Structures are given as C-alpha cells and as structure tokens.
Amino acid sequence: MALKMVKGSIDRMFDKNLQDLVRGIRNHKEDEAKYISQCIDEIKQELKQDNIAVKANAVCKLTYLQMLGYDISWAAFNIIEVMSASKFTFKRVGYLAASQCFHEGTDVIMLTTNQIRKDLSSPSQYDTGVALTGLSCFVTPDLARDLANDIMTLMSHTKPYIRKKAVLIMYKVFLKYPESLRPAFPRLKEKLEDPDPGVQSAAVNVICELARRNPKNYLSLAPLFFKLMTSSTNNWVLIKIIKLFGALTPLEPRLGKKLIEPLTNLIHSTSAMSLLYECVNTVIAVLISLSSGMPNHSASIQLCVQKLRILIEDSDQNLKYLGLLAMSKILKTHPKSVQSHKDLILQCLDDKDESIRLRALDLLYGMVSKKNLMEIVKKLMTHVDKAEGTTYRDELLTKIIDICSQSNYQHITNFEWYISILVELTRLEGTRHGHLIAAQMLDVAIRVKAIRKFAVSQMSSLLDSAHLVASSTQRNGICEVLYAAAWICGEFSEHLQGPQQTLEAMLRPKVTTLPGHIQAVYVQNVVKLYASILQQKEQAADTEAAQEVTQLLVERLPQFVQSADLEVQERASCILQLVKHVQKLQAKGVPVAEEVSALFAGELNPVAPKAQKKVPVPEGLDLDAWINEPPSDSESEDEKPKAIFHEEEPRHTRRRQPEEDEEELARRREARKQEQANNPFYIKSSPSPQKRYQDAPGVEHIPVVQIDLSVPLKVPGMPMSDQYVKLEEQRRHRQRLEKDKKRKKKEKGKRRHSSLPTESDEDIAPAQRVDIITEEMPENALPSDEDDKDPNDPYRALDIDLDKPLADSEKLPVQKHRNAEAVKSPEKEGVLGVEKKSKKPKKKEKKTKEREREKKDKKGEDLDFWLSTTPPPAAAPIPAPSTEELAASTITSPKDECEVLKGEEEDHVDHDQERKSSRHKKKKHRKEKEKEERPRDKKKAKKKQVAPLENGAAAEEEEEPIPPMSSYCLLAESPYIKVTYDIQASLQKDSQVTVSIILENQSSSFLKNMELNVLDSLNTKMTRPEGSSVHDGVPVPFQLPPGVSNEAQFVFTIQSIVMAQKLKGTLSFIAKDDEGATHEKLDFRLHFSCSSYLITTPCYSDAFAKLLESGDLSMNSIKVDGISMSFQNLLAKICFYHHFSVVERVDSCASMYSRSIQGHHVCLLVKKGESSVSVDGKCSDATLLSSLLEEMKTTLAQC
C-alpha cells in the first residue's frame, strides 16, 4: 500500500499542472488547437485514475480550457467527484469548475443535492462557504426547493462569514423558488439588525433588490430602514436604503414628509458625490409625491437644484451626466426652478462628450416656453451648422422639431417663423431625417389653416429650386422634403401665385431621378394642380391657354409612364389617359374643369397614429379563426412566408415536419433562384416603395456625397428665420406697450405694486389666428392599449404579500426520518403533568416580559404608528393609528370596524386583561354545561344575556346587513359636471383639513381650464399657490374628457372648529365641443360640519372612565323619536358619518368616543328604546358639543 502511494506521488511529479498547460499553449501559437486537443486526451486519461489529487489537477486544467471557450460538459460527473473530496483545496477546485459549466440543463446536477447539503452542514466554515458560493452560480428550481431550509438555517450561524453568504444566496433561491420567500422573510428581516455590518449590508442588499421590482410588499419595513438610515455610517448601505425609499415614497405619501429632514441633512453634510446624488434623487421623488394639494417645499427644491448645478459644473463627465439626468426629473414638476439655469444647460451643448450634449438637449425640451422658444431654437440652429458628425446633427434636427411641435405646437406664436426654420433645415446635406422635416411641413400645413398660403408659397419656391435639394437621393435623405412640397402645392393649389410655373417645375425631366415614392406624389399632385389651372382658365374664358396646359401634360407624362417604379407607372398611365380624354373634349369645346376638379373635392384631415388599432371588433367576428383551414402538409413551400405587417408569433400549433438539413435547404433555395433567373416569364421581385421606406439604411450605409461648393447652399427666395425673430420681437414689444397703456388707464389714482410687470406665457398672443385641426379617430374607438407585462419576467412570481400570516401549506419542505410513535405510559404522563404544573409560574413571568418587549418592538415597527407624529395625551385615551380610512365608498359592518380597532390596539393590552379573558373562559365553560341541561324553549331568553363588549367588539347575534354608505356628499351639479366632496382631517395638523373633490364630466364636451375658488371667511381660508391673491382661484390639475371623473384635493386652514360653517364657492371651466368652446361657471356652498373635524380614535373603558370622572367636561343631550333601524346599524352610522369609535356596548346601550383635530375630547352614551334613541354627550367645549349633537340629530332622524 505504501509503495503504491509513493508510486502515485512520483507519477504526479511528471503530470502537467495548470502552469504547464498555460506555458504549452503560449509555446504552440501556430498549432494551438492541435495542442489543446492533445491536452484534452491526456486530461481524459487522468480523470480515469483513482487518485483524487490527479482528478483535481485535471479538473483545474479543464476549468481553464472552459474559459477559453472549450466545452467540458462531458466531464460533469468527474467534477462532482472532485466536489465530494474531503480535502478543501480539491473541493474548491470542484466547486469552481461546477460554477463555470453547470447550468439548468446539466443532467447530473441532481446528484449534487446531498453533497451540497453535507457541505452546508460541515463544521468547517470554509467548506460551507465554498458550497454556498458555488451553489449561487448553478442553483436550479429543484436545488432551491430541496436546500432552501438548510440555507435558511445557516442565516442563524454563529460565524458572520457564513451568515453573510447565506443571506446573499437566498436572493438566488427566491428567484428560482418563490414559495420560499414568505417562510424565509422573518429571518431575513432579523438580519437587518445583525451586529455584524457585513451581514447587515447583505440583508439590505437582498431586500432592496426584491423591493426594486415589487416595492408595495416591503412598505412595512419603512420604520426599520429609517432607523438604519439615521444610524448607519456606511455610504454603500445608505445609498441602497435611500434608493429603496425613493421607490416606496410614491406608495405612501406620509413617508415623504418623514424623509425630507434627514435627507436634506445628508445633502448638507455628505462629501460623497454618489450619496449626494442618491439623496437628491430621492428628495425629488418625495417632492413629486407631495406635490398634489400639499404646501410647497421650495427650499428643498432650490437646495437640490443648487447641488445638481455643482455636479453639472464638475469636471468629471460621469457626475455631469448624472446631474443633468436628475435635473430632468425636477423639470417635470418644478420647471421654473430649472429654467433659471438655462445658461448652464446651453453651455453643455458645447461639451466634447456627445452623451452629455444629448442629455442637455432632452432638458431643453422641457424648458421651452412661448417666451424663449425662438431664442433656444436659434441657439440650436447655430449648433447644427457647427456640428461634427451626422449622428449628433441628426439628433439636433430631431430635437428642434420635437421642441417646436410638442403639445400640439402650443409654444409657437408665429408659424411663419416655424415654416422658415423647416425650410432652413432643408439645407442640411447627409441627414437621415428628411422624412421628419417633410412630415412636419405636411402636419403644419394641414392643421394650421392660417399658414397655408405662406406654406404654399415657400413650397413652390422649394420645387423651383428642387435641383439643389434633389442632389441627395438616398432613402430618407433631404430630398424627402420634395414629397411634402409637391403634396402641399397640389392639395392647396388655390393659394399658389404662379400655378403654371409650379406645374412646369414638377414636370421637369430631372424629377425622374428622384426616388419612386416621391415621383408618385409628384404625378398625383400634378393632376390636382392641372385641375386648378384648368378651372382658372375656363373661368377667364381662355380656352387656348387651357389647351396648352393639357398639351404640356400629354408631352411630359410619358416620362413617368416609363418609370421603373410600378406605382409611378400606374398613376402616370391613368392620369395620361384622363388628360387625353380631356384633350378630346376640349377639342369639341366642352367645358371639363368642374368635372376634373370634382375628382379632388373635400379636405384631407390627419388621422391619429393608433386609429386602426382602436377600431372596435364587430360582434361575432373572431380574428383568430382560420378563414380557410390550412392544408395538412405543405411540401412546395420551403420557407416560412414573411409577416405582412409585423413579426407575428404563431398562435396555432401545426403538425411538426421533420427537420431538414440546413445545407440541403440552402442548396434547394439556390437552385430555385437559378431557375427563376433563367425563366424569361418570371417577374423579378423588387422591394416595394413602402417596404423600402421602412427599411432605412443605417448611418454606416449612407453614401458620402461631395458638395459642389460652387453651388450656393442658400435657396433663392427663401426667408431667413432671423428676420422673423426680429419681427416677432417688434410685435411683442408693440403688444406690451398697448397693454401698458391700458394698465395705466385702469391704475390711474391707484398705487402701482410693481414697476416692471413681467410677461407670462399666456400674455403672448399668437401672430396668426391658430385653429389646429385635431386627429381623426374611428367611431366607438377603444381605449389605448397597454403593453402586457413580460410573461418571462422572473420577478413576477416574487410579487407576494409578506404581511399575511404564514399558512401551514407554505412552510418549507424539510427532510425527516419516519419515526414510529412512542406509546406513552400513564406513569410518565403523570410525571410530565407534575413538572408542567411546577413550571407554570416561571413561564407566566417569561411570557409577560416577552410580551412587553414585543409590544415595544411592534409599536416601533408599525408603519401607521411610526408615521403618526402626535404624542398621546396624559390622562386621555391612548391614540392609535388613525382609522380615517373608514371614509371609503362603502362600509361592511361595525363588526368589521371594531375588529380593526381591536387589532390595532392589541399591542397595548396588558396582563390584567388576560385574567379577565381567563375568567370569561370559565364563565363560558359553565354556560355550556347549563346549556345542555336547559330545555330548548329557553334558548331565546338566554341569548339576551350578553356580556359587555369593549372597544367596539360586535354583538354575537346576527344582525341585518348594513346598507352601503358613502362619505362623499353632493356639492353641486349642472348638465356639464357633477361635483361631490368629502372633508378629511388629520391629527398631525391641528389647523388644516383637506377637501377631496370628485369632478365627473356628465356631458359630451371636453372640460378644461378648470379653476376652483372658495371665498375666505374670518375663520376658514383656502390655501392658494404662492403669489396668489385672495380672489384668485386654485387651478384643478387635470382635464376631463367626456364621461371621465377624477379627484382633486384642496387644503383649508381653520382657526376655530366649534361651529359649523358654509362657504360660497365657484367652479369655472371651459367646455369644448365640435361647435366651439364656452366658458361655464357653477356656484356652490361648501359645508364644513363639526363632525368633519373629528378623527376616529379608539379608547379603552378605563381611560374613558377617568375622562368622565375628571369633571372638566360640559354636558348636553338629545332624544330622537321614530327610529326603526337596528341598534347595530345605528352605531355603524354614527361611527361612519361622525367619526366615533365604540368603547363599550351592553345590550341596547353603548359608550362612544372621538377626538377633534384640536384635542377636544367627545364622549357619548347612546341608548335605544323601542322606537326612540337618546344621546347623552360630554365634551371639553360646550359649543362644539351642541353643534355635534345637532348634526347627529339630523343623521338619526333619517334612520
């Protein structure tokens, strides 16, 4: 045996190791493949040996070869053998090889389960660590399911090294086996408070990655992460947590208010640019979520913008890019804050880095207004001239057009200037966006009627100088503008000054060098122009001139008939025959102008891009059904036919045909093509104009065109945009002077508030009367399609509610030995019973301490409690999370409400109540015994003896169902709009209430420019935007299409809440329909009841009794007769409409409690008689109590 070992050791001395393999590959550069194949043969021999060291050496060399691209899957079994080695150095080699080449398709991977489980339970931390590292690379759903419990156990390992790796690999396990997330989550959550910073950061990383895709499931962890954020000094952990808060804030706006202060402190204090950027990013997300109806945080916005300016001015290009990226997010909600830094953004356009220039361009898009549009476009036009490289120049061109055309051209005040800009852009050579300029020319000419005359004159000039533009004839080149020019001159030919000249320009022989689709448009619009000229000549009784025009067409059209493009041929042939027919009729003296013009009667309006998609499918039409059943076998077709419109996924499965060899298919294809080429009767396929239009060549395929500098680049007769800029400035100056004169007349004798009045966008009137035609849609158009989520997304399965209690079926599978049940002897049972009894007092003490500790922990981790910043009153009931969510559209029953309150207060129950519950159990047991002995006819009498119910616990007997209730009341209604409202109070703000208003469009008109104004009283004032006067309204931040409703929130400041009050208000809006737009107003009275200032606050009977005994409360009472509603439903109505909670109920008597936003305590005792209800109330303010009881009387009278 010893000799054998010695011999094996000597043999290994002569084996090639990894260093020898690498050295050999370097020495055999000429025949590397041959050398490696020899080495692989040697390795195969080494793997057949029994010595594990030799095998490990062979696997090590195979791992290197795998990195060079060689397949080593054939050695998978040998790799598993090395993984199972007892020596760590060999085991590590095996796991490295497995992590390199094992995947879900590896057959032998199932053999690794027991080996990995054995290594995970190894006493050596290094064996466990290497197993965890390797498993993370090749984990499969089966491995994840089988090993999840073992890995979860390692999360509580004594060594931080193992805990950290176990926490990290759980993320991979969750992805492969999502069912393990819920059972493992409590332990993962514990690791957030691990004493080791490495384990803690690993847990933060895993949870942040999970929350990035499904943030709503991790909202309950916000208090814990907030604690980490304020205590951690690790920048990496802080960045992760701050990014997570950025995702959670839109889901819980209250969280944003809590985050503002610590985040701004971090922004001020941190020197790390990465942390600064993430803080700014999250503050932006917070402010976006708080922007609706809440007060401004202008200081925070200004701070963010200042810090981002520092980033943008930094010499580091990465920081500059990130600063511009974050600035674009602020721009969406606070554009004015960013617009003041326009100079800095424009400087970035001169940056060497193209990505920064492009990001600055994106920012300019949002910074544009009516005032600065011309200035920004002028700056961009100078960059177009200086731009190097077609890619950036094309991007500039696209951005100029996007900036001008955004929101239906709302920033353009002078469309003549815009047409001149588009014409100037036609001078660009080598651009790929000629079709974009052409599309804009067409769009503006069609939509803006006032500009058509000017547009036609410019397009005719463009057609006259077509030889300059047509020099670049590649697809999507600048010659595409001739497409638009020809169409506009033909469609709106009545505006042409010299139609004859334009017609001759369109019939020049050089036109035949243009692409086919442009020639086709030329031919089509030549006949439109011809019809217009014919009508003019006939009206002037100039028959000779009309015949000359006809003769011109007869002579020039044959050049188009001979075109290689089929569409041009077809159109030219049809029109030529039409013109020849007209010529015959002219020879006979028959007037034909009206009939020819009738061919082109009517206007062409733009069609919405998705109009075809939105056409509703008729009833009974199945678009997926076969029109003709497919043949069973298709032998003639070798290739799959191409989709006509887009790449379609096969929806119907067909019988699989046997796969044919690729070489055989290629050979057949070549033979068929050769046969077609030799066949004189076969028409060769050429790409259609539409297809060629779609397949635009890339930048690399654009041919380089030499510019003849002897030809002037400026098109004669074309206007310069600078002239229009000056004219526009003069026009605006005159407009300002006229307004100043009017203002001076009005303000005569009044004090002037501002010496230099600023000009807003709305003050700038357009140069022309703009009537923009909207896009046409089909009848009964369907709503826009939403892209379905990717069905292969691995994160979809991890969208799991983690707050729901764990069911038995969700526990992780654990391998167990089947044990036979041991039969317990009565003697042993007796001994165990004595032991249990003796341990009871100690257990009770432990349970009490644990419960107190859990109370504190739960209190800190409860999201609602944490977000509530109001401290509890000293001798008052303990305030819990606000249950104001009862103001939903319906309520199920007081039973449910009380259970909610009970659940929220469970954390505050002390062990005194346990004794109560034990006594209750004894009573219950005694009652059950008596129940068996009593006769059945006494059951009804027994049911009436109900024990007192605390904190709103519902009665045991079944009551009638509660009708649905809504907290929203009708505010006002007109044929156009219906307005309902609800007033919501909050404990956190003692002088503010939020009025939620739902606006529903009841008409067929489009409602826009909505504005709500409520007249302030001495007591109640509406919160308005900064700079607004008392008489200004608050704009509603949305528009209402027909049949749509939306909700807006408005904040009111209240001084005294003891009296109800009504405020007058007006809702003004513009109703736009096909006939035009009308300005409408709707008056209303906003009723602030005293109940709207109350907040549902749970209270225990002990605290309630102390409050009543204090003697500080005033008393009042009411009685209402004619009540037919059940007591349960009555309590539900009081709870819902007046925001009370049930403290205790006995039979037909209940004590109730509520609290106002200014801290007034309101206690009620509600008693129901046969047909009447009496309510005794006590409150810290007598006026508030009498007002509340009056409101309650009105509610009870309806019962």
From Swiss-Prot:
Compartments in which it is found: Cytoplasm; Golgi apparatus membrane
Q: Which residues carry this modification: Phosphoserine?
A: 632, 634, 636, 688, 754-755, 760, 784, 825
User: Ranges of Acidic residues compositional bias?
Assistant: 773-790
Q: Which domain of life is it from?
A: Eukaryota
The family database entries (SUPFAM superfamilies) matched by this protein are listed as:
ARM repeat
- Compositional bias per record (Basic and acidic residues), positions renumbered to this chain: 639-651, 665-675, 791-836, 847-862, 894-916
Where does the secretion signal sit in this chain?
Answer: none
Q: Does the keyword Transport apply?
A: yes
Q: Where are the HEAT repeats?
A: 34-71, 142-179, 180-216, 218-254, 257-296, 298-336, 337-373, 375-409, 521-558
Gene Ontology CC annotations of this record: AP-3 adaptor complex; axon; axon cytoplasm; early endosome; endosome membrane; glutamatergic synapse; Golgi membrane; postsynapse
The chain's coiled-coil residues are: 659-679, 722-750, 843-863, 911-934
Q: Which family, according to the similarity comment?
A: Belongs to the adaptor complexes large subunit family.
Subunit structure, briefly? Adaptor protein complex 3 (AP-3) is a heterotetramer composed of two large adaptins (delta-type subunit AP3D1 and beta-type subunit AP3B1 or AP3B2), a medium adaptin (mu-type subunit AP3M1 or AP3M2) and a small adaptin (sigma-type subunit APS1 or AP3S2). AP-3 associates with the BLOC-1 complex. Interacts with SLC30A2. Interacts with CLN3 (via dileucine motif); this interaction facilitates lysosomal targeting.
Name this protein carries in UniProt? AP-3 complex subunit delta-1
